[in-house]
Curated annotation (Swiss-Prot):
This is Suppressor of cytokine signaling 2. Substrate-recognition component of the ECS(SOCS2) complex, composed of SOCS2, CUL5, ELOB, ELOC and RNF7/RBX2. Interacts with IGF1R. Interacts with DCUN1D1. Residues 151-197 form the SOCS box domain. Residues 8-22 have a biased composition (Polar residues). There is a cross-link at K173 (Glycyl lysine isopeptide (Lys-Gly) (interchain with G-Cter in ubiquitin)). Its main location: cytoplasm. Substrate-recognition component of a cullin-5-RING E3 ubiquitin-protein ligase complex (ECS complex, also named CRL5 complex), which mediates the ubiquitination and subsequent proteasomal degradation of target proteins, such as EPOR and GHR. Specifically recognizes and binds phosphorylated proteins via its SH2 domain, promoting their ubiquitination. The ECS(SOCS2) complex acts as a key regulator of growth hormone receptor (GHR) levels by mediating ubiquitination and degradation of GHR, following GHR phosphorylation by JAK2. Ubiquitinated; mediated by AREL1 and leading to its subsequent proteasomal degradation. Ubiquitination is dependent on its phosphorylation at Ser-52, by PKC. Ubiquitination is stimulated by LPS. Phosphorylation at Ser-52 by PKC facilitates its ubiquitination and proteasomal degradation. Pathway: Protein modification; protein ubiquitination. Coiled coil: none annotated. Residues 6-30 are annotated as: Disordered. GO terms for biological process: cytokine-mediated signaling pathway; intracellular signal transduction; negative regulation of growth hormone receptor signaling pathway; negative regulation of receptor signaling pathway via JAK-STAT; proteasome-mediated ubiquitin-dependent protein catabolic process; protein ubiquitination. The gene is SOCS2. The modification Phosphoserine is found at S30, S52.
Length: 198
């Protein structure tokens, strides 16, 4: 089962609960809510999280994009938080992201779910599949059995990313040992905030 949004009922402390539930006082989020909030905060820094967007709006954004271009948006299905919309060889398509027990993974049929990797954050999940697609992609050939390959290659940004973030991505692509670089500590801290290549 995936995470469902908890309905807040009543007034006062119960009504003030976060939509993801809290443990203890209204000021102190549960560990689960804190993990989820951290993952969503990280996602909001990417520049390719579009927030609330319909399926048709996502299709419109991706229709002229090259194959492999993707964006993350809020899911229109109440059992899921997020959806990946991606341009495939057959046109734009959507894939839900499942959140369960503090982990994110791609939604799939039950017999395959246990084999799919799980991640602490959505950005880590996307980064993993983008890197995997870079390693395996040899060309845009269509599969022979009628299935469509899902390639994640390039995010569709909501707006031009800040130069600082683009520099951080470039550094992340070149090294995984930020602390060995001859940079000020404050800059190293900034680089450590986002360790991904996408």
């Amino acid at each position: 089962m995936t995470l469902r949004c908890l309905e807040s009922s009543g007034n006062g402390a119960e009504g003030a609960q976060s939509q993801w539930g809290t443990a203890g006082s209204a000021e102190e989020p549960s560990p689960e809510a804190a993990r989820l909030a951290k993952a969503l905060r990280e996602l909001s820094h990417t520049g390719w999280y579009w927030g609330s967007m319909t399926v048709n709006e996502a299709k419109e954004k991706l229709k002229e994009a090259p194959e492999g271009t993707f964006l993350i948006r809020d899911s229109s299905h109440s059992d899921y938080l997020l959806t990946i919309s991606v341009k495939t060889s057959a046109g734009p398509t959507n894939l839900r992201i499942e959140y369960q027990d503090g982990k994110f993974r791609l939604d799939s049929i039950i017999c395959v779910k246990s084999k799919l990797k799980q991640f602490d954050s959505v950005v880590h999940l996307i980064d993993y599949y983008v890197q995997m697609c870079k390693d395996k992609r040899t060309g845009p050939e269509a599969p022979r059995n009628g299935t469509v390959h899902l390639y994640l290659t390039k995010p569709l940004y909501t707006s031009a990313p800040p130069l600082q973030h683009l520099c951080r991505l470039t550094i992340n692509k070149c090294t995984s040992t930020v602390w060995g670089l001859p940079l000020p500590t404050r800059l190293k801290d900034y680089l450590e905030e986002y360790k991904f290549q996408v």
